[in-house]
Curated annotation (Swiss-Prot):
SUPFAM superfamilies: Family A G protein-coupled receptor-like. Residues 1-54, 112-128, 191-221, 295-308 are extracellular. Pfam families: 7tm_1. It comes from Gallus gallus. Belongs to the G-protein coupled receptor 1 family. GO terms for cellular component: non-motile cilium; plasma membrane. This is Neuropeptide Y receptor type 2. The keyword Lipoprotein applies. A lipid is attached at C346 (S-palmitoyl cysteine). Its main location: membrane. Keywords: Cell membrane, Disulfide bond, G-protein coupled receptor, Glycoprotein, Lipoprotein, Membrane, Palmitate, Phosphoprotein, Receptor, Transducer, Transmembrane, Transmembrane helix.
Length: 385
């Protein structure tokens, strides 16, 4: 639950709304609560309204968006462009990049605007769409990381060299999106775009969760706890178990020859890279999930003076996972590092930079050489990749 969503909760009394309002919307100067009605537009009190804090938030969100769009687009580009990169594991990594791109382009810009303005001014459609899209992308990322871990566990621990076919991998990706869409759907359905009158003559537009049920049965809390288990705790338990067994297997492995040593070393590096991806995902999302859970269980957390700032900082940390993955690919995986470099090189250097794609380029050079033997044939300059 976001800081402004709490004000729009259906089960809150006017007194509770006023109490929460005094935490978030009191004027910066000292004004008695009884006189708030005299000021038609009281200012936000929390630190997120300070200019210097807003500049930092703008820089943080824009940096995440820029790095995420560039990095994830590059991952998708090299997997599509180079045939040697079209492996099952890389298809799953590309799916991870697509999910992160969804967050970078559709969620973060609107979240930043919502945070800076202090109320939802983006209309009812985006009110339902943005939270749903973010939840969808996070679910897809978690499912994809789990599938990658299980696939590598199957191949390395049990020596099953018959890999998952590309057709099956696409089917798994489709199922991942379908299941994720179903799990995230309550955030689009049980949502309300409303105008809330906090005090007389002062209203704000709120995009808040609106769950059915009354009394002690809080469906919002039930959903939050369920998603924490399904989206975070259970996948991380499965992934940790899989990579622990993989690590143990590789550590105790004895290679009979130099060729197998090289193959074993490559597997180790790839596994290390994927473990780092999972660790970054787990660590970056842990503060946000924990804070969300505590907020849903204990409403007194909403009374914290800097609740909105804490929520925003944890959200920024969580969103860092959307650009961290491409950095890990480029840093820890030779294939990706080579492909990234190739994307910025000219074709005449392709064969020296990326041997896997050199055959087609060499064939083209031979054809151009034959043409250049005939008078009148002009030399064709190679184009950029």
């Amino acid at each position: 639950m976001g800081p402004l969503e709490a004000i729009g909760e259906e089960n809150q009394t006017d007194e509770m709304k006023m109490e929460l309002f005094t935490k978030l919307y009191l004027p910066r100067y000292t004004t008695p609560v009884s006189e708030l009605a005299l000021d038609p537009k009281p200012e936000l009190k929390d630190s997120t309204t300070l200019v210097e804090v807003q500049i930092i938030l703008i820089f943080a969100y824009c940096s995440i968006i820029l790095l995420g769009v560039i990095g994830n687009s590059l991952v998708i580009h090299v997997i599509i462009k180079f045939k040697s990169m079209r492996t099952v594991t890389n298809f799953f990594i590309a799916n991870l990049a697509v999910a992160d791109l969804l967050v970078n382009t559709l969620c973060l810009p609107f979240t930043l605007v919502y945070t800076l303005l202090g109320e939802w001014k983006l209309g009812p459609v985006l009110c339902h769409l943005v939270p749903y899209a973010q939840a969808l992308a996070v679910h897809v990322s978690t499912v994809t990381l789990t599938v990658i871990a299980l696939d590598r566990h199957r191949c390395i621990v049990y020596h099953l060299e018959s890999k998952i076919s590309k057709r099956i991998s696409f089917l798994i990706i489709g199922v991942a999106w379908a299941v994720s869409a179903l799990l995230a759907s309550p955030l689009a359905i049980f949502r309300e775009y409303s105008l809330i009158e906090i005090i007389p003559d002062f209203k704000i537009v709120v995009c808040s969760e609106k769950w059915p049920g009354e009394g002690q049965l809080n469906y919002g809390t039930i959903y939050s706890v369920s998603m924490l288990l399904i989206q975070y705790v259970l996948p991380l338990a499965i992934i940790s178990y899989a990579y622990t067994r993989i690590w143990t297997k590789l550590k105790n492995h004895v290679s009979p020859g130099a060729g197998n040593d090289h193959y074993h070393h490559r597997r180790q590096k790839t596994t290390k890279m994927l473990v780092c991806v999972v660790v970054v995902f787990a660590v970056s999302w842990l503060p946000f999930h924990a804070f969300q859970l505590v907020s849903d269980i204990d409403s007194q957390v909403l009374d914290l003076k800097e609740y909105k700032l804490i929520y925003t900082v944890f959200h920024v940390i969580a969103m860092c996972s959307t650009f961290a993955n491409p950095l890990l690919y480029g840093w820890m995986n030779n294939n990706y590092r080579t492909a990234f470099l190739t994307a910025f090189q000219c074709e005449q250097r392709l064969d020296s930079i990326h041997p896997e794609v050199s055959a087609a380029f060499k064939a083209r050079k031979k054809l151009e050489a034959k043409k250049s033997q005939f008078p009148g044939d002009s030399f064709t300059q190679p184009t950029n990749v």
